């Protein structure tokens, strides 16, 4: 942290502890592509966690740590990074709003797929997800609302 001019309270040796997801995670793959680029590589020595909640928990407990996770896993006990846009514009803080309007540069959509046109119980479930009740639950869990693409 000291090399980039940042003082982190409680971080005694100023060494950045990088917390990541395991390489079989879609979150890992998306972050790698969106942030590190097609040929980018994670550095050696990352602490690879099983799930997003595990990443957030470790970052919260480790003063020198930095990590990435889905917005729905954010807590009041960690600081979320404001990310610069590729065009050099002002940085954008992560929120449901900036994920929904796609202004947060590393927000990603989540998709649900069906084998053919949904029918029966699957159609009922998808209709419920798009309903006001379903959308309230999605927003309450920290995810952006569902949009038809």
Predicted regions span which residues?
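Flexible loop/hinge segments at secondary-structure junctions
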Residues: 1-149
């Amino acid at each position: 942290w000291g090399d980039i001019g940042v003082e982190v309270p409680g971080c005694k040796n100023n060494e950045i502890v990088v917390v990541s997801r395991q390489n079989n995670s879609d979150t890992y793959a998306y972050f790698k592509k969106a942030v590190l680029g097609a040929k980018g590589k994670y550095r050696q020595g990352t602490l690879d966690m099983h799930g997003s909640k595990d990443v957030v928990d470790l970052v919260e407990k480790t003063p020198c740590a930095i990590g990435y996770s889905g917005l729905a896993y954010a807590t009041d006990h960690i600081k979320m990074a404001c990310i610069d846009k590729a065009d050099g514009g002002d940085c954008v803080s992560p929120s449901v709003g900036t994920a929904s309007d796609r202004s947060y540069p590393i927000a990603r959509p989540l998709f649900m797929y069906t084998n053919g046109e949904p029918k029966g119980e699957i159609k009922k479930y998808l209709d419920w997800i798009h309903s006001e009740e379903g959308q309230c639950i999605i927003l309450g869990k920290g995810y952006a609302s569902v949009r038809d693409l």
